[in-house]
Amino acid sequence: MRNRDEFAEWAEVHGHLYGTPARALEGALGRGLDVLLDIDTHGARQLRQRYPEAVSVFIMAPSLAELEARLRERNSDAPREIHRRLARAREEIAAWRQYDYLIINRDVKEAVDQLAAIIQAERCRTGRLTLKFPDVEVPE
């Protein structure tokens, strides 16, 4: 699929290949759905190139120390893997200005509320709306 350009984006992350099939993404968008993708900075860059109208949100922990504590708390990664993830996080954090929005995840509920607010605001952008008023001519 990768060689046939069937992915909207793809990346190798922590030794694993991930990708978003373009057909599935475009089908969901064509049905008017909001689509959320959990992708790295390389995938986000690919999406912006292929879909310039895409909205990007960078979500990060309040600090690298907090991220490390969360990774250790999960108790699912070996110390070497945690070290690798922290190094990758440093690289990704450096790219935060390439995104449309930034959420600092201090509290899960607050982060979810902020993401919901972004989605709602984006739905209201005039460039995304098609209005039909029977008594008013609205130029397109």
Role assignments for model-derived ranges:
Residues 46, 66, 110:
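Phosphate- and divalent-cation-binding pockets in alpha/beta enzyme and binding domains
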Residues 35-40, 49-74, 105:
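Conserved phosphate-donor/acceptor-positioning beta-strand/loop module used by diverse small-molecule
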Residues 27-30, 48-52, 94-96:
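Conserved catalytic network of the ASCE P-loop NTPase/AAA+ motor domain
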Residues 79-88:
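Glycine-rich S-adenosyl-L-methionine
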Residues 4-8, 70-77, 118-121:
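Conserved AAA+ ATPase "sensor/coupling" helix adjacent to the nucleotide-binding pocket
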